[in-house]
Amino acid sequence: MPFFDVQKRLGVDLDRWMTIQSAEQPHKIPSRCHAFEKEWIECAHGIGSIRAEKECKIEFEDFRECLLRQKTMKRLHAIRRQREKLIKEGKYTPPPHHSGQEEPRS
């Protein structure tokens, strides 16, 4: 037990904010993955962790993708590789504002 409980003195509950994104946020702004987490929690609530692992797999995968963005990053990496390949082959020339050659606007 801490000598001076800062969270209690300030009236904030950082532990709840950091564990569940669906919890009430300090500025009333929902987190990016609020909807996905809520669906997963609603699906898994009351059925136990073993059943929830099987029955709520789709909801959990959606929530995980929203948090980590692994599929999105993989897709962006593939697009970037294709773009670089086309530039190297001479089939695509990026616009000047993409390569930093255009003068800045005033």
Swiss-Prot record:
<keyword id="KW-0679">Respiratory chain</keyword>
<keyword id="KW-0472">Membrane</keyword>
<comment type="function">
    <text>Accessory subunit of the mitochondrial membrane respiratory chain NADH dehydrogenase (Complex I), that is believed not to be involved in catalysis. Complex I functions in the transfer of electrons from NADH to the respiratory chain. The immediate electron acceptor for the enzyme is believed to be ubiquinone.</text>
</comment>
<keyword id="KW-0999">Mitochondrion inner membrane</keyword>
<keyword id="KW-0249">Electron transport</keyword>
<dbReference type="GO" id="GO:0005743">
    <property type="term" value="C:mitochondrial inner membrane"/>
</dbReference>
<dbReference type="Pfam" id="PF10200">
    <property type="entry name" value="Ndufs5"/>
</dbReference>
<feature type="short sequence motif" description="Cx9C motif 1">
    <location>
        <begin position="33"/>
        <end position="43"/>
    </location>
</feature>
<dbReference type="InterPro" id="IPR019342">
    <property type="entry name" value="NADH_UbQ_OxRdtase_FeS-su5"/>
</dbReference>
<feature type="disulfide bond">
    <location>
        <begin position="43"/>
        <end position="56"/>
    </location>
</feature>
<keyword id="KW-0813">Transport</keyword>
<keyword id="KW-1015">Disulfide bond</keyword>
<dbReference type="GO" id="GO:0005758">
    <property type="term" value="C:mitochondrial intermembrane space"/>
</dbReference>
<feature type="region of interest" description="Disordered">
    <location>
        <begin position="84"/>
        <end position="106"/>
    </location>
</feature>
<feature type="disulfide bond">
    <location>
        <begin position="33"/>
        <end position="66"/>
    </location>
</feature>
<dbReference type="GO" id="GO:0045271">
    <property type="term" value="C:respiratory chain complex I"/>
</dbReference>
<protein>
    <recommendedName>
        <fullName>NADH dehydrogenase [ubiquinone] iron-sulfur protein 5</fullName>
    </recommendedName>
</protein>
<comment type="similarity">
    <text>Belongs to the complex I NDUFS5 subunit family.</text>
</comment>
<dbReference type="GO" id="GO:0032981">
    <property type="term" value="P:mitochondrial respiratory chain complex I assembly"/>
</dbReference>
<feature type="short sequence motif" description="Cx9C motif 2">
    <location>
        <begin position="56"/>
        <end position="66"/>
    </location>
</feature>
<comment type="subunit">
    <text>Mammalian complex I is composed of 45 different subunits. This is a component of the iron-sulfur (IP) fragment of the enzyme.</text>
</comment>
<dbReference type="GO" id="GO:0005739">
    <property type="term" value="C:mitochondrion"/>
</dbReference>
<feature type="domain" description="CHCH">
    <location>
        <begin position="30"/>
        <end position="74"/>
    </location>
</feature>
<keyword id="KW-0496">Mitochondrion</keyword>
